Amino acid sequence: MCVPRPDSPSVFGSLLDRSAGHFRLSPHDRTVPAARRYLPGGLVLETTWQTDTGWMIVRDALVMAPWYDVEERSTTHRRTPSDWESEHMLLRTVRCVNGTVDLYVSCEPAFDYHRGRTEWSYTGKVYEEATAVCRNAPDEHPTLRMTTDLRLGIEDREVRARRRLHKGDTAFVALSWSDCPMPHTFDEAAVKMAATQDYWREWITTGRFPDHPWRTYLQSSALTLKGLTYSPTGALLAASTTSLPETPGGRRNWDYRYAWVRDSTFALWGLYTLGFDREADDFFSFILDVSRDADGMRYPLQVMYGVGGERELPESTLAHLSGYDGATPVRIGNDAYHQQQHDIWGTLLDSVYLHVKSRGHFPQTLLHTLRRQVEEAAANWRKPDRGIWEVRGEPQHFVSSKVMCWVALDRGAKLAELQGRPDYARKWAAIAEEIKADVLEHGVDERGVFTQRYGHPSLDASALLIPLLRFLPADDPRVRATVLAIADELTEDGLVLRYRVETTDDGLAGKEGSFTICSFWLVSALVEIGEVERAAALCQRLLDYASPLKLYAEEIDTETGRHLGNFPQAFTHLALINAVVHVIRAEREIGAGNFRPAHLGP
């Protein structure tokens, strides 16, 4: 857990090293629970524990509540504040539901990725309140406050508590890094827990979800995306973790606690489709914020940003941490922020186009930003780059990057037409046609299949976006050939790889699992070419791979079903929404007699 921001240094990091901080609340003699779930309609986690003598239920939540400090303006909010805010508090409640259970609590923060020294002290005259600070840098890290109805014992860097619970007994522990009022009784804790669940249920009710067996997966993905949103700015984190390995014990370990511009198109499409217009608008506003000039300086559009809009995200390693299951290095920061990736202009322009179509108007303030990004794409599309997968090998002429530059010019031309600027529209449309012709000449093999890069026959899953981005119509034989080639040749046990590591210079050693987002892209692409039954079967299989909490990491090991990489991953959940909606709409059109596979023509 990282506080006060999701990209701040961790205080509980046992996921990456058992000595890097923990907060355990469980039966004294158990480490594996009997069951775990989110309460329906929200992000309140419920864990059921069974012992030889009884059962108990633990509920965990990051507390949401109406605005607390109404007389002082927030210094972090750039988006319009809602009626609710986070109380910056982790609340844990316990209820024994059968027999007796010996409850055990252990909280040992390890500030600054276990580089700081923790010092606990009692607050006041009672055992039920304590405070933890980073002793060697107290002003640089938040103070942690704990309240509970258990008696706490301080043992060096750790506080502990224990109690024998009988059927009907309750307990709570709250940990805060803010000045919001904390609970001092179980009843007060229960009120906060109930209010938090009410908040989530009210929020999810504002969405639009089809009456379908897959509805719960859409709702879970929507909740996950909301949970990954940094509300003060609207930024959407790629994931909430760093350095969970893409290969067990391997070195493909990255920090994903940042916002990628690339996520914007799928984020807006998914959020608008499900009815979460406010969240879509907030993320769109964040993307516009970071793409504009600042402090009189003109900054180029970057691949990624900090959740507060920070431009510099220098990468370093934490050699003192052993890594998840021994996988090193543990990285913080991400050097991809200064890579040249030419798809970013297309994703930004596609986002603007989606926003304008959804909202029905084109804000005049967008025109300058729009023109800059279109001109950047026009000036750079002929150059090699690092590509959508942020390879750390040599820059290449990646087909997906050229396609996204086409998107930038195509959407720019359409938007210019809407703005009454036919001069720009004609100019940009002509360049878009030039890019398309170049891709069709150099990026398609003799089979009529789109390749990964110019001059090489390797396949790449990013080509599945070609029909989704309308680079070519879905009934074009090259689109169908590409989708089927990827489905047949770039899969392991039916799940899609992003590319073959043995034919792609990504600057790294080792294998990786199938990329779940790519498998969901295949679902959408199969629907586009009329293979609805095949798409539905693959979609159901992918949904079956979901974790017990309906969450997805970046990759799946096809041999074991194990999730690999950072978790949960926003891009995967965005692709899930796109795929599920594609299948549901196609099946309903077939049922109504309106669906015609693209390859059959009009």
Regions found by a protein language model. Name each.
Residues 1-602:
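Acidic, mature catalytic/reactive cores of soluble proteins
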